[in-house]
Amino acid sequence: VEKIGVIGFSAGGHLAASASTLYVDGTTRPDFSILVYPVITMEPSVTHTGTHDNLVGTVSEWVNDDLTVREYARRKSAYHDLMEKYSLENQVNENTPPTILLLSSNDGVVPVENSLRYYNSLLENKVSAQMYIYPYGGHGWGFTTSNFGTDRIEAYRGLFFDAINTFLSEQ
């Protein structure tokens, strides 16, 4: 094996993007990443709430009325630090591996803004990046055997595979 990459869908896309941006050293950095309708940011107005709450918790879990002013401020700061760290568009740098993002413009679960932010950060840091936004398909399309061939992305499945194959051939 010459290269090892990561792939993730939805919250798994956040995990794959975390591996691509929060790695410890060059030996733990993937060589490329494939992100499919990924959760990227923890910003409340854009994130997927379930992923956010499972990863960093809710504000009410961090701060409440029973705290001293000092402890309230400390916890609120720690909460915001975690949100910043796990808003992966803020963690991209020139060493982030080449990335392809694939999603649908009508995703009603993970806002498209997640992928747009990550893609723009990749470009700003001169990281090789590709993004494919299909006009429909919603969220959660994929390759389950129960609806393969009749799911919401059927019309684009060939394009999806072509995009990934082209991306992989360039790595």
PLM regions: where:
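Short beta-strand/loop motif that positions the catalytic acidic residue
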Residues: 95, 100-103, 107
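Acidic catalytic loop of the alpha/beta-hydrolase fold
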Residues: 42, 106-110
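Primarily recognizes the serine-hydrolase "nucleophile elbow" in alpha/beta-hydrolase
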Residues: 1-51
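Residues at alpha-helix caps and immediate loop-helix transition turns in enzyme cores, especially N-
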Residues: 47-48, 111-115
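Serine-hydrolase-like catalytic core of hydrolytic proteins
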Residues: 1-2, 110-111, 121
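C-terminal catalytic histidine-bearing segment of alpha/beta-hydrolase fold enzymes
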Residues: 102, 113-171
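Loop/turn elements at helix/coil->beta-strand transitions in domains of secreted/extracellular proteins
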Residues: 1-3, 29-32, 96-99, 125-130
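Mobile cap/lid helix-loop segments that gate and shape the active-site cleft of serine hydrolases
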Residues: 39, 43-91, 97
